[in-house]
Amino acid sequence: MSATTAHAPGDGPLCLVTGATGYIGGRLVPELLAAGYRVRCMARSPGRLHDHPWIGQVEVAHADVTDAAAVRRGIEGVEVAYYLIHALGTGEDFAAIDRRAASVFAAAAKDAGVRRIVYLGGLGPAGDGRLSEHLRSRGEVGEILLASGVPAAVLRAAVVIGSGSASFEMMRYLSERLPVMIAPRWVRTRIQPIAVRDALRYLTGCAALPRDVNRTFDIGGPEVLTYEEMMHRYAAVAGLPRRVVIPVPVLTPGLSSLWVGLVTPVPGPLARPLVESLRHEVVCHEHDIARYVPDPPEGLIGFDEAIRLALKRIRNADFATRWSSVSAPREPSDPLPTDPDWAGGSLHTDVRESEVAASPETLWRVIEGIGGEHGWYSWPLAWAVRGRLDRLVGGVGLRRGRRDPYRLRVGDSLDFWRVEELLPGTLLRLRAEMRLPGRAWLELSVEERQGRTWYRQRALFHPRGLLGQLYWWAVRPFHGIVFGGMQRNVRRAAERAAAPGRP
């Protein structure tokens, strides 16, 4: 029996999404809206929701899930309640907090007459008394919700593949930063990962489950892989050389989490329980969910395609775009503005700005005239040497110049840059076409604040593998000379052009 139900926009049952500022919650909301459901988001910090493109289409309830009175107010009138909260990474006794929060939520849902609870937990071996505290806590929360008296669907997933997922980000950083890795035995553990868009499709479909369904469902993608195989496959899709992984038996979960903390930016309190859980085989034992939420005709998304989707924004150079265009629809595998700073892959930046004693129009003329015969307003020798080195390794070098000495358009070559985005009078974004172990952009912009003109300059670099990381840190000491000099000289050029007596 299929649980898929279509509703007219905004005409469906009211769904409550807890954890809407989290990884899954923030991506589930637009899926529910697209399916015609009305949505209320419950958040401890509602201000963190404001950058989402869907904020104007939802209700917002301010509540801490351990506050019974606030939860009762937030859940009133709700038909389907999504419980997407866990205390992992708080550094406290997260299992006790999870039990208390789930009990409060379950009682409030029953008192409010909620028709369905949907929870996303962790996949683990059944009946294993040696479960990690993380997986054991997820299981306890599921049991509390199943015993609530409200029909519950407890979905159990292993690693969710998508930009922003903590498990995926840990694998991404390990794969990108370590060409050779001495690894613990858990790299040989079997895992059944699932693409985030497939997980969201199951979660959305559970809103229409029959009332008599009160059970767990294992959800996973079409492949079972070891962690080592996942790292090798990630490297292949990302265009990295094959990784060398040497398993050793001596690294305990505690030591492994310390090592992960050194290599990746994933916080230690979050990395440790994730690492501890990797010693367990996490493979689906059934696929009963397909009886209610059928698999798509083309099948579930495979691991390689899930990685490609997660890396799509990087490949399309969308790293440089800002969150000012949050109204644009985004894919579930894309990063979101509420994702942690460490999510989405490495992005190094050099940001400088200064007030300019000139009109915005005068400053823009200087910016649009940069490069070619006008130069780069910075240490000329450094640019010349970088251009010569680029030519020596088969790059384009500095000799391309520019099409027009004063005007630019999107697609123009500009020495070893390409004009990627141009908003006349406001923004010039250049993408580097020099040979680099990564991708680089240079963004020059004009801002007017309270009648004053400001120049903002931002250099961005997305490293490719360990060599890319080493390259950034090797050239970083020179940024003060190159980019600092550019910022000062662009400002001075605009102020000279604005001086009295200049044409």
PLM features per residue range, with description:
Residues A432-G480, V490:
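Beta-strand/loop substructures that line and gate deep hydrophobic ligand-binding cavities in soluble
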Residues A8-Y37:
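N-terminal Rossmann NAD(P)H-binding glycine-rich loop of SDR-like oxidoreductase domains
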Residues L28, A35, G127-L240, L258-V266:
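Oxidoreductase cofactor-interface core, primarily capturing Rossmann-like NAD(P)-dependent enzymes
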Residues Y37-R44:
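Conserved glycine-rich Rossmann-like NAD(P)H-binding loop of the short-chain dehydrogenase/reductase
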Residues A3-P9, G205-P273, E281-R352:
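Mid/C-terminal beta-alpha module of Rossmann-like enzyme folds, strongest
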Residues T18, M42, L84, I117-L123, ...:
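SDR active-site strand-loop-helix element
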Residues G47-A112, G122-R130:
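NAD(P)H-binding glycine-rich loop region in Rossmannoid oxidoreductase-like domains
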Residues L347-H348, E355-W364, E368-P437, E448-Q450, ...:
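Glycine-rich portal/gate segments that line the openings of hydrophobic small-molecule binding cavities
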